[in-house]
Amino acid sequence: MAQPPNPYAALTPTEAESSGPFEPETLLPLINRALPLAQALPSQSPLVAVGRGSSGRTFLGVNVELPGLSPLHSIHAGQFLVVHLALNNERTLNCLAFSSNGSYFDPPCPHCCQLLQEIRNASSTKLLITDPSRQRDMSLSTYLPQKYLSLYNEVPKYFFARLLDENRNNGLTLINPNPIRDCLDSEICNHLSCRALKAANRSYAPYSKSPSGVALMDFQGRVYSGWSIESVANPILGAAQAALVDFMTNGGGHEFNNIVRGFLVEKRDAKLSHLATAREILNKVAHFSFILRVLHCQ
C-alpha cells in the first residue's frame, strides 16, 4: 500500500523555484498546509515558520505544545524549523517567515531569535515581516534585545557557523559500551545506543560543554533521534524535543504514544544534565510502557 505524502516534506529547489519568490502570496499555500500540523491546544495559537535553506529547499516548522506539560517544554515553531534544517543537513538559512494565519508575517519570539542567531551567516537571513501598511525584509539582529546582542559580540567567532554543521563530531565515546552491541559501523546502524551517541556527537553545546543525544524507537522498530541545541543567551532546546521533531517529520506525526523505548547519551560529569527534563517529557507523552535508558560518554 502506498504511503500517504509526508505533510512536513520540504519543497525541492525546483518546487520552491516554480512556486515563486519568497513572498506572502507564494507562501500562503505552505502556511495553510502547515497550520493544521501545529499542536497548540492550550494556547489556541498555532504558528508556522517557513525557511529556505542554502540548498534551495524550503522547510516548515510548527509550534508543538506537549500535552500535560509546562509551556516551558513546548517546541517553538522556530526551534522546530532549526531542527528540521539540521536533520536535513542544511548549512545556512537564506529566507525566513513566521505566520499564524497566512495574512500577516510576524517577527520571531525572543527564544527563537536567539537560537536563530547561532546559524551561520544569520545576519544575512532575509526575515519577511508584514504589517497593514507595508511589507519589508528585516535582519534577525533587529529583533534581538540589545543586552543579548552585546553577548554575541563577546563570544569568540569560532563558536558560530556551527549550529547547522552536518560534519560536526564532538568526539564522544561511550564509557561502558555493551560488547554484544559493538558495531562494525556505528554510523549506519540502528541500535538505539549508537543512534543516541551519534546524536550527542552532533549536539551543539559550545557554552555549557554538556552535549546530549536522544534516540527513540516506535512500535514498528523505527528509530528517531535528536540532539541538544544551545544559544549564548541561555535558551536550550533539549535532545528529547529535537528527537520528537524527527519523529513528527519522518512519519510519526503527533502519535507520541507509539514511542516505546529511548536512550539518552550525555557526559557523566556534565555541568548541565538533560536527563530529568527528557524523562519528564517522554514519560508524559510516550506509551505507558516507555523505558528510557541512560548511557554516559566521555
Swiss-Prot record:
Superkingdom of the organism of origin: Eukaryota
Q: Does the record bear Cell membrane in its keywords?
A: no
Disordered, as annotated region: 1-23
GO terms for MF: cytidine deaminase activity; zinc ion binding
InterPro entries named among the record's database cross-references: CMP_dCMP_dom (IPR002125), Cyd/dCyd_deaminase_Zn-bd (IPR013171), Cyt/Deoxycyt_deaminase (IPR050202), Cyt_deam_dimer (IPR006263), Cytidine_deaminase-like (IPR016193)
PROSITE patterns, A to Z: CYT_DCMP_DEAMINASES_2
Known cofactor(s): Zn(2+)
Q: What biological process terms from GO does the record include?
A: cytidine deamination
Which residue intervals define the domain CMP/dCMP-type deaminase in the entry?
A: 22-151, 187-298
Q: Which UniProt keywords apply?
A: Metal-binding, Zinc
Q: Which CDD domains match?
A: cytidine_deaminase (cd01283)
Q: How is the cofactor bound?
A: Binds 1 zinc ion per subunit.
What Pfam family is a match for this entry?
A: dCMP_cyt_deam_2
Give TM regions.
none
Q: Which residues bind substrate?
A: 63-65
Binding-site residues, Zn(2+): 76, 109, 112
Task: Indicate the quaternary assembly.
Answer: Homodimer.
Similarity comment: family membership = Belongs to the cytidine and deoxycytidylate deaminase family.
| Name the UniProt record assigns to this protein | Probable inactive cytidine deaminase 9
Q: Which organism is it from?
A: Arabidopsis thaliana (Mouse-ear cress)
Q: Which gene encodes it?
A: CDA9
